[in-house]
Amino acid sequence: TGSSVLPEADETIHSGTGRYAYIKMRPMSLYESGESNGKVSLADLFVGKPFETQTNDLTIDDITYLTCRGGWPWATLISKEVALDQAFDYVDSVVNKDIQRVDGVKRSPERAKLLLRSYARNISQQVPLSTIRKDMLANDSSTLDEDTVTDYIKALKKLFVIEDLEAWNPNLRSKAAIRTTDTRHFVDPSIGTASLGLGPKDLINDLKSFGFFFEDMVVRDLRVYAEALDGKLYHYRDSTGLEC
């Protein structure tokens, strides 16, 4: 996450087809960082093995902390106070350096911040690009069209900061209309909380917002587990309200 290829490196001498394999490195899941006991296996669920509901010893304080800390490897090894700063430092680096270095295009750090904040306010929700643009315009007095917003989003996706969740469309004969708008997500929930300047106590004081960030963390972990099985994660929602 955040370790993108520099512009000049895009001009590869050899494509590497047949020689190299690309591996997507993600932030650590709760199982990888040792906070999840891993008693329920996704692989077992897919083959229909029976399972029992499991519990762990994590409290609401623990979960809000883990949401704000994120799955950054170094953050899992240091004190809680210092660990929470990692996401803030990461966001600062993205908006002030990486957003321009990723493809050599000059972009405004302030607009990058506005976009991250707007994404964080709409995290785990199916909102169109127009909604994000309006949210940014409320804090940007200059002209801001959808093409500009799209450009910033593409740059942040290339930096592995933003990773929306695609809608699953089974194309079945159903009277229910399938919602096809992507769900807005970060690669790690701590990017969203840091973008809004939130900490664990802020999430506890606003449990509704915490629910959206918690969903973002669940999506992060499920992506890790699904990809280990050569799978891909999608969301589903239809006009009847059925959602998964």
Where are these regions (language model features)?
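Conserved RecA-like P-loop NTPase ATPase core
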Residues: 1, 33, 67-70, 156, ...
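Interdomain motor-coupling "hinge/lid" segment immediately C-terminal to the ATP-binding subdomain
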Residues: 3, 9-125
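Short beta->alpha connector loops
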Residues: 3-6, 239-241
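Hydrophobic alpha-helical segments and their boundary regions
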Residues: 7, 59-60, 177, 204
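Accessory nucleic acid-recognition modules appended to NTPase machines
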Residues: 76, 80-243
